[in-house]
Structure formats: structure tokens, C-alpha cells
Amino acid sequence: MRAVGLITEYNPFHNGHLHHLRASREAAGAEVAVAVMSGHFLQRGEPALLDKWRRAEMALRCGVDVVVELPFPFACASAPHFARGAVQCLDALGVDSLCFGSESGDLGALQRCAQLLEECGEQVAERTATLLRRGMHYAAARSQVCAELSGCDAATLPLHQPNNILGIEYLRALRATGSAMQPFTISRLGAGYHDDAVGPGNIASASGIRKRLAMGETVDELLPAPAVDVVAGARADRLFPDEDLLHRLLLAQIFRGRDYLQSLYQVESGIDARLTDAAATSRDWQALVDAVKVRQFTRTRIQRTLMYILNDVRGDLMASLLAAGPLYLRLLGSSPRGRAFLGAARKRRRLPMVTNLSRIYSQLKRTYGPRSEDYRLALAMLELDLRATRNYSLLLPGWSGVSRERDFFEAPLDIHSAI
């Protein structure tokens, strides 16, 4: 069974995602669509709109066949680490191809950029850092450097838009890992990431949809019908994360002091002081981010740093986990066709597949050996995923007493597509 891989957040699953899913199957000639999806905290440094099980349910009801979770260290990371972790998960599952959306839609142009960044990586990093110190923003600085090195006009290089940037990192990850997955890209339809407008086919950006939900507006026409029901249920039960709760939890962590903050991942010299100063007076989450942000770091980078603080992510450990790569595959759900694929691909799978967390410790011990470094890192990676679920539950106003150790009680979803 030919399988196409999709790297996703589904925050939430909307009409643009449905287009991407269907176009990816067609482009790759695939019978099965396999999604690796972020868990409770996302690449841009924010909690997901819906918990990972509801988002997996939306995906499966809308036609995805397999959903596996991207572990926290990669889900809430910079684009290169996010891309590499996701590519490694799909490769370990035995997926044949990878199809991603991009503003460019030009695979050749994206591959040329990926090759340039691989071959001239040190030069790009050094020159970009120089421009950042002069006050230029990161995306513009990297585009200018790549234009200078390639001899192209910066405006012709697809390095500004978010999906192009991720696409280039997926291509770099394929090269770096030696993956045999064949890449495809399809053009994004409708609104860009930061655009609140609705495009043809009722396609809006995920951020635009979240803004509408926050303002109490209806979004039914922007989502496939099966996703509408899932979002409506979470909305009625007050299970969207609350920014005020997020802000208060972050303040409690920041008030532990600068020595503590300096032990955490990406809390660099100077940021710890800005954090403690901002925590003393900030009125809400957005004000906290605004007060900490400095020119050389993007807003997204600051938000990710705050998620590391919330989840107590130690610097030395995170560096080791990112270097190791994903050490298990957490199955969130599958369709009948997806289960057939997983069974057929079992012998090709290169990482342990976790379906029951009550048995994961013995499963990891058998796979890696009880005294191995990989076993130690796998347990640490698992603990971060479990911590993310516990902390996410603290952000939900309507949490009703379901165990915060929910990871141990949720079996993989078994769902037929509804469309």
C-alpha cells in the first residue's frame, strides 16, 4: 500500500487541510495518508486550540488514515528541529512519500534553496547573525544572505513565507537523514498564515479561524462537517485553553528565580532578566511576550521559550533529545485502511509503536536495553509528553475531573472517515 506522509498541527482541521489531504493523495498516487501531528504545544510556541485526541479525531473523520504524535521536543521547536523530527517519524513508519503545502508550489525552487542552505550553512548563519545585530528581522536577513550567495534577487527566493520556510526544512531533513521518501508540494489555497480573510472555497487560515472562535463567531463554513461537531463540542464544554490561566502558570514558573530560568532551554543571558522584570508587571500573556521580545529574536522564538518554562524543559536534556531524534511512535488513531497499512509495514518500522502507555516502559526497555543511553532519553522524552498533557489540562476552564494522566487511559482512536 503506497502511503503519503503529512506533517501537521490541525489547529483546527479546516477546509484548507482537506484540500491538502486530497491533493496529496492524488499527487503521490497514495492509497493511505499518514499524518504526524503535534501534541498539546505547537511549533509557534502556543498551546493547541483542542487537545491532541480531538484533533486526531477531526483528521480521521475527514479522511486521514493514521495519526501519530510528534514528541514534544520536536513539536515545540525551531523549524529545522520540527522538520527533522517529523521526517524521522514518517520515515520510521515506512511511508513512501511526503507532500507539504507551500506558498510557492515550486518544488524545484524550494529544493534549490534547501541545497544552498546545506552547502553554505555556516556562511548563511554567520552573515545572518551580523544582519540581526544590525537590527534586521530574521526572515529578511536570511533572504538577503541567500540572495547574495546565490546571485538571485531576494524577492525571487521563497524564503519569507512560513510554509515555504517549513517546506525547505523538510527537504533539508530528507537530505540530512538519507530518507528515501519522495517529496511533493502543492500550492496553498486561500489566506496566508496571518491573513484573516476567507478565500475561495471557504478556505481561511488556522489563525484566522482561531481569532473568529475567540470572538464568539461561527466558523462552521470554514471547516469540514465532521470537524464542526468536534469544535462545537469542545467550545460548549469550555475546553479551549485560556490565556489568563496560561499567563498565571507562567508567572509562577518565572517567579522561581533567575538561577532556575537559566537552567532551562533557550533562556539565554539577558532573557532571564527581561522575564523577571516583565513578570512583575505584565497583565496578560500577550503583554508578557511583548515585554520580553527583543529585535534579534522572533516573537515565535520568545513564545517557544515560554513553553519551555511552562513545561520545565532543561537545557542540557533538550539538546540531547533533539540530537537523538524521536525514539518511539505514539499512535493516536487510525482508520481500517490505516490499520491495514500499519500491519503491512510492521517489519519495516524502525521505531517502537506505542499503543498502550501502561506497557511502554517494558516496551522501551526491550527495544533499547535497560542501561542504554537511548532508553534513558526515551524515558525523558516520554516524561515531557506526559508533562505537556498534565500542564495542558491546567489551561482548560471546563476541565471536569478527568485524570490529568489521560495519556495512560486513552486508547488509539478507531474511526471510519465520515466524508
Swiss-Prot record:
Origin organism lineage: Bacteria, Pseudomonadati, Thermodesulfobacteriota, Desulfuromonadia, Desulfuromonadales
Assigned EC number: 6.3.4.-
GO terms under biological process: tRNA modification
NCBIfam families: PRK13670.1
Keywords, ordered alphabetically: ATP-binding, Cytoplasm, Ligase, Nucleotide-binding, RNA-binding, tRNA processing, tRNA-binding
InterPro entries reported for this sequence: Rossmann-like_a/b/a_fold (IPR014729), tRNA(Met)_cyd_acetate_ligase (IPR008513)
Residues noted as binding ATP in the record, renumbered to the chain: 7-20, 101, 163, 188
GO terms for cellular component: cytoplasm
Listed GO MF terms: ATP binding; ligase activity, forming carbon-nitrogen bonds; tRNA binding
Chief location of this protein within or outside the cell: cytoplasm
Task performed by this protein: Catalyzes the formation of N(4)-acetylcytidine (ac(4)C) at the wobble position of elongator tRNA(Met), using acetate and ATP as substrates. First activates an acetate ion to form acetyladenylate (Ac-AMP) and then transfers the acetyl group to tRNA to form ac(4)C34.
Protein name: tRNA(Met) cytidine acetate ligase
Subcellular location: Cytoplasm
tRNA-binding found in the keyword field: yes
Reactions performed catalytically: cytidine(34) in elongator tRNA(Met) + acetate + ATP = N(4)-acetylcytidine(34) in elongator tRNA(Met) + AMP + diphosphate
Stated family: Belongs to the TmcAL family.
